[in-house]
Amino acid sequence: MKSTFAPFARPLYVMSKPIGSACNLACDYCYYLEKSHLYKQNPKQVMTDELLEKFIQEYIESQTMPQVMFTWHGGETLMRPLSFYKRVVELQKRYARGRTIDNCIQTNGTLLTDEWCEFFRENNWLVGISIDGPQEFHDEYRRNRQGKPSFVKVMQGINLLKKHGVEWNGMAVVNDYNADYPLEFYRFFKEIGCHYIQFAPIVERIYKHADGRHLATPLQSGDKLAVFSVSPEQWGNFLCTLFDEWVRNDVGTYFIQLFDSTLANWVGEQPGVCSLAKTCGHAGVIEFNGDVYSCDHFVFPEFKLGNIYEKTLVEMMYSERQQTFGQEKQTKLPTQCQECEFLFACNGECPKNRFAVTADGEPGLNYLCKGYHQFFSHVAPYMDFMKRELLAERAPSNVMEAIREGKI
């Protein structure tokens, strides 16, 4: 029997791209810069005030919960003037109708000023900073269009955020270069006072498109792996080494998204990150012109759901097509994954990385599988302990004392 369609069983979430893919940096591994090729007919790729208002009103009215989260992403979001985001706040207040509105914005940090930071603090915006660890690691790939390094400017921006008391977190890309130095990486974030950290593995394949794009879509078999991609072995070693440092010293003080999500899956709760969830499809993207796509990592013509001027957000995000997109994260898992002891923790990770084949030659295996399996095997005793603590309504941070006492 076909399951009943319940469109409001989960919240609607759409990330906004007010500047499209435009950016003042040209990071070698960026998967979004080349999206400009999809909109060559739009010389000025910025969200208009008209579209902004339509999106904000419709997005708020589409929510079934009293809290509404807006996420502003790029490209480089601060290439839009401060007046644009002041307009955002005005419109949110106009259409809130009693709902609590929260905002988070992702930036490379190089354009931050006192004025920006005052705005973020006054309006309680959460700021995500893209920074790839210490200067040597960061500047390897994160440079501007003239090839000049960006680390110094990013740190100036972070210091401004701290000066003004702005809430912020770190997002670091783990690549072929920095993956070999997990402790230096992690300790750097502690030194700069970053307590919430997301480590994202970069995996891309090369595929020449007629329109100038050079990265493969999830449906294409890329000619070769991009040189900056982290290897499965590197990823596994990185996570295990990092975890050993964290679980002995920093549980409850420093929060690493992947570790928190893993523990959530261990106790049967929602992981809070789509890549480790059973299904996905609940986090869409709206481009500067109103085009809506299935996911930030699936901004390709094949995954365009429509345009906000032609369809509502509800129609697109709860469409059968998007439902299928999300369900296929689970239904298209190869047999090796379905029979894996850690399926509950991994759930196949992100579908965009499922271009490897299993030992039996079945397609659809995640490229990073070996690394994740190494990680889950390594952390299992500690996760089991923290799970017991949580179920007994005790602090997971008790794991640190248990390790010191030799109980684990």
Descriptions of predicted regions:
Residues 1-118, 122-124:
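Conserved alpha-helical substructure of the radical SAM core
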